[in-house]
Amino acid sequence: MLVFAGLGNPGKTYENTRHNVGFMTIDELSKEWNIPLDKTKFNGQYGIGFVSGKKVLLVKPLTYMNLSGECLRPLLDYYEIPVDNLKVIYDDLDLPTGRIRLRTKGSAGGHNGIKSTIQHLGTSEFNRIRIGIGRPVNGMKVVDYVLGAFTDEEEPAIKEAVRQSAKACEASLEKPFLEVMNEFNAKV
């Protein structure tokens, strides 16, 4: 089974914030693939279905961002899914708004959701899809920025980035992640 995990914060308050682009991508995949997120277990909301003949699990950890690993580790253990089958989708301050970047491993880069995931998985070697949200300007605190809504100017770029992230997830069903990474990272 392949797992696509979108990181974010639960609840209406955070629904359309920069920190929730991972959740937005999972919602997009849920619609496209007709996989309802109808299960709640392991501190996560998830659904299981078949896409292109492959069994797929979509999950949104409901632990709040900084504790995301507390959902992912037990979920992988319960379904006996190797870490190699996991793709984590999340926001990245170090990428320009709307840009996506795929990686096969790496540090948390200051992202607490990834830090928790690395800690609970016991490895930093898992596939990632990073969605750029840019950096705050005019002295705005990072926490206020990531928990803030996108501006009207940012909306189109973010919607396209979520679509591209979903396309990268879909491509990874048919091709090795490294090949998908090279393809999508080459796009400007």
Curated annotation (Swiss-Prot):
The record lists the catalysed reaction(s) as: an N-acyl-L-alpha-aminoacyl-tRNA + H2O = an N-acyl-L-amino acid + a tRNA + H(+)
What range does the record give for the signal peptide?
A: none
InterPro entries reported in the protein's UniProt record: Pept_tRNA_hydro, Pept_tRNA_hydro_CS, Pept_tRNA_hydro_sf
Q: Which SUPFAM superfamilies match?
A: Peptidyl-tRNA hydrolase-like
Q: Where is this site: Stabilizes the basic form of H active site to accept a proton?
A: 91
- Show the PROSITE patterns listed in the entry: PEPT_TRNA_HYDROL_1, PEPT_TRNA_HYDROL_2
Q: Tell me the active site.
A: 19
* This protein's record includes keyword DNA repair: no
User: What EC number(s) would the UniProt record show?
Assistant: 3.1.1.29
The UniProt keyword set, sorted, is:
Cytoplasm, Hydrolase, RNA-binding, tRNA-binding
* Family assignment from sequence similarity: Belongs to the PTH family.
Instruction: Kindly give the NCBIfam families that the UniProt entry links to this protein.
Output: pth
Self-association state and partner proteins as the record states: Monomer.
The protein here is known as Peptidyl-tRNA hydrolase
**What organism is this sequence from?**
Bacillus licheniformis (strain ATCC 14580 / DSM 13 / JCM 2505 / CCUG 7422 / NBRC 12200 / NCIMB 9375 / NCTC 10341 / NRRL NRS-1264 / Gibson 46)
